[in-house]
Design a protein with these regions (language model features):
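Terminal cytosolic tails of multi-pass membrane transporters
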Residues: 362-385, 403-461
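Helix-loop-helix junctions that connect adjacent transmembrane segments
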Residues: 70-74, 106-262
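Membrane-helix boundary/coupling elements in multi-pass transport proteins
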Residues: 18, 41-56, 181, 185-193, ...
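Hydrophobic transmembrane alpha-helices that form the core helical bundles
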Residues: 2-83, 88-91, 96, 266-269, ...
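TM-loop-TM module centered on a large, flexible mid-protein loop between adjacent transmembrane helices
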Residues: 24-25, 31, 63-67, 144, ...
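Membrane-interface loop-to-helix entry segments
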Residues: 75-138, 178, 182, 204-212, ...
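Helix-loop-helix connectors at the membrane interface of multi-pass transporters/channels
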Residues: 24-27, 54-77, 106, 111-114, ...
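Transmembrane helix-loop boundary segments of multi-pass membrane transporters
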Residues: 64-75, 94-105, 260-264, 321-360, ...
Length: 461
C-alpha cells in the first residue's frame, strides 16, 4: 500500500522540489486552500512524532540503565537531555545529523541481519519457519480467541484467552505497520538541501519503502519463527513486546548480543526523534517563509549552517512543553507517563494525521498530472496507482477510527486520546479557513502559498 503511494509521490518529486513536501505537492495539485490545510496537519504530525519518540527514548534509556547498572534516573530528566541534544543537532548543518543517523542505521541493520540470518540457518525454532507470519492476507484477519496463528499449528491454549488479542487485532496490526514506516516520505523534505534532488529523492524514497520494507519484514519473520508462534503471540501481547526481539537475540546470538540490542534501541529511538525533529522544523520553516509575519524568524535560515535554526529551536521548545505537560499530569512513572501516554497517544495522533495527508497527496498527484496536466504523466503511475494508494490510505484511516479505543490501550480512556480525531480535524479546518481569509485579504500572498519551490518558473504560476 505504501509502495502504491510512493509511486505517485516520487512522480511529483521529479517535478516539484520543496522543503514542505506534502504542503508544496498538495498546493501544486489541489490548490492553496487544501495545501495549507495539509501543511498544518503534516506539521502537527511531525511535531508530535518528536514528542512521541522522546517519550519512548526516555523509557528505553531508563530501562537500559537499570538493567546494566541498577540506576533509574527520572524519565523527565532523560527526556530533557534528549531534547537538548536534538536541539544542538538541529541548529547545525544537516550533514552532521545525517552522518549520525547514517551510523545508527548501519549499526542497526547489521545487528538485525546477524540475528535474522542466524535464525534462518537454524531453520527457525520449534515451529520451523512460520509461513503464515508473512502472508499479507493474514494482516487483515483477526486472531481467533484461543485459536492458532495462521500458518502454524501452535495454539494459544489457556495462556491467553484471545479476546484482548483478537479484538481489532487486524486493524491495529495494520495501523502499527504504517506507524513503523512513517518518515520514509521525508526524503522530499531535504530536496532543497541536496545537490540533485530530482535524481536523488525518487530512488531514495523507493529504497526506503521497498528496500527497508523487505528487510524489516524478513527480520520480523525470523524473530517470530525463532521464538515460535505461541511464545511470539504471548510476548507481543505482554507488558514489554520488545522482549520478542531481545529474546531472539539472547537465544541465537548469545547473551552479550542483548547489550548491543539495548544500546541500539536507545540510540535508534533517539535517532528517530532527531529525524522527526528535522522534518518538523523544515515544515515550520516552509510555512514561515511564505507568511510575511514569520519570514524573518521561522522562515529564516542560519547564515553559516544554512539550517532553519529558529524553526528548529521552536520545535525543540514545543517538544519540551509537551513533555513537561505529560510529566506534570502523569508524574514519574516511566511506563505510564513516557511509554503509554507520551509515546502511545502521540504516535496514534501523528499517524492518523499523516495517513490523511498521504491520501490527500495521492489525490493531488492525480490532479496535477491528469486533470491540470501541468506535466505529461503516465496514466498508470500518475493516475491508477495513486488512486489505489489513496483508497488504501483511507481504508487504514477507517480501520483506525473504527478501533481507536483498542489502539490506545490503557490510555484510551483519557480525554487527550478521545480528542485525537477532533485535534486533527480542527488543525485542518484552521488551515482551510486561514487560507480562505488570506485569499480574501491578500490575493498576492495567497498566490504564493505552497509555491516556493526549487523548480522551473512555470511551477510558480
Amino acid at each position: 500500500m505504501l509502495t502504491l503511494f510512493a509511486v505517485g509521490f516520487v512522480a511529483m518529486a521529479r517535478h516539484v522540489t520543496t522543503t514542505g513536501a506534502f504542503y508544496g505537492f498538495i498546493s501544486q495539485g489541489l490548490g492553496q486552500v487544501w495545501g495549507m490545510a495539509a501543511g498544518l496537519v503534516a506539521t502537527l504530525a511531525y511535531v508530535v512524532f518528536e514528542g512521541s519518540l522522546i517519550g519512548v527514548f526516555s523509557y528505553f534509556t531508563q530501562s537500559t540503565l537499570d538493567s546494566w547498572w541498577g540506576i533509574k534516573p527520572n524519565w523527565f530528566l532523560l527526556a530533557v537531555i534528549g531534547i537538548v541534544l536534538i536541539a544542538l543537532f538541529g541548529h547545525y548543518d544537516i550533514n552532521i545529523a545525517a552522518a549520525f543517523l547514517g551510523v545508527c542505521l548501519v549499526a542497526e541493520v547489521l545487528l538485525l541481519a546477524a540475528m535474522a540470518f542466524t535464525v534462518l540457518f537454524h531453520g527457525g525454532g520449534d515451529d520451523g519457519l512460520i509461513a503464515g507470519a508473512i502472508n499479507p492476507v493474514n494482516a487483515f484477519k483477526d486472531l481467533a480467541a484461543g485459536g492458532n496463528m495462521p500458518g502454524s499449528s501452535a495454539s494459544l491454549g489457556a495462556s491467553i484467552d484471545g479476546t484482548a488479542v483478537a479484538a481489532g487485532s487486524a486493524a491495529i496490526g495494520v495501523f502499527f505497520a504504517f506507524w513503523s514506516w512513517v518518515g520514509f516520505e521525508t526524503t522530499a523534505v531535504y530536496g532543497e538541501e541536496s545537490r540533485d534532488p530530482k535524481r536523488i529523492v525518487p530512488p531514495a524514497t523507493m529504497i526506503a519503502v521497498v528496500g527497508l520494507g523487505i528487510f524489516y519484514t524478513f527480520v520480523s519473520w525470523m524473530a517470530v519463527s525463532g521464538t515460535g508462534a505461541k511464545q511470539s503471540i504471548e510476548t507481543s501481547a505482554g507488558s514489554n513486546p520488545v522482549d520478542l526481539m531481545k529474546g531472539t537475540f539472547d537465544q541465537y546470538l548469545g547473551h552479550p548480543s542483548t547489550y548491543a540490542f539495548d544500546f541500539l534501541i536507545v540510540t535508534g529511538s533517539f535517532a528517530c526523534a532527531l529525524a522527526f525533529h528535522n522534518a518538523a522544523s523544515r515544515y515550520i520553516y516552509a510555512l514561515g517563509r511564505e507568511l510575511p509575519a514569520f519570514q524573518n524568524n521561522l522562515g529564516a535560515t542560519h547564515k553559516v549552517h544554512a539550517s532553519p535554526h529558529v524553526a528548529s529551536a521552536t520545535q525543540s521548545l514545543i517538544t519540551l512543553v509537551i513533555t513537561i505537560l505529560f510529566w506534570a499530569k502523569m508524574g514519574n512513572d516511566v511506563v505510564q507517563a513516557a511509554y503509554i501516554y507520551e509515546y502511545g497517544v502521540l504516535a496514534v495522533l501523528g499517524t492518523m494525521a499523516i495517513l490523511l495527508v498521504q491520501a490527500l497527496c495521492s489525490i493531488a498527484v492525480i490532479w496535477y498530472f491528469q486533470v491540470k496536466k501541468v506535466h505529461p504523466g503516465n496514466i498508470v503511475t500518475t493516475g491508477i496507482i495513486p488512486a489505489l494508494g489513496a483508497i488504501g490510505m483511507l481504508y487504514v484511516c477507517y480501520l483506525l477510527f473504527s478501533n481507536l479505543s483498542f489502539a490506545g490501550g490503557a490510555a484510551s480512556g483519557s480525554l487527550l486520546y478521545k480528542l485525537i480525531p477532533y485535534i486533527v480535524g480542527a488543525t485542518a479546518l484552521i488551515g482551510l479557513l486561514g487560507c480562505l481569509y488570506i485569499k480574501s485579504r491578500d490575493p498576492a500572498l495567497y498566490q504564493r502559498i505552497g509555491r516556493t519551490v526549487l523548480e522551473d518558473a512555470h511551477e510558480r504560476d
